[in-house]
Amino acid sequence: MAIETGFNQSAAETAVNQIISGGADVRLMTTSLDYDDTATELDTKEVSSTDYTTVNVPDADWDISVDVANGELTLTNNALVDFGETQNDWGTVVDVAIHNDGTDDFIRADEVNDPEITTGELVRFPAGEITYTLGP
């Protein structure tokens, strides 16, 4: 029996492309996402400040790379994702969702630093900062 499980390259590319095709919304979460969450749960776990809005990233602004030797696929933003300057406190961001708007499909990227976002901060992800790796 195999030690490693998961998608093969073709299936991984198909799954990720389904989410980013046509553009994907980057959403900041103040409550941890769960494996079985749907778009409804995303709405309740997202930053709730009145000056916050999701950022749609066109599919051309995402890069997919494959490391065949290690069986990994990596999705990375190749352009600035800019939420702008906060006018209110947004709370502590614990997860980032890359969401196919209008569906229940999303990629959960753990925000390992759990930043507390307060009034007057510029919230930006430079190219290469949002990275999701699918594989062992």
Stretches found by the model and what they are:
Residues 1-96, 100-136:
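Small cysteine-rich, disulfide-bonded extracellular modules of the LU/uPAR three-finger superfamily
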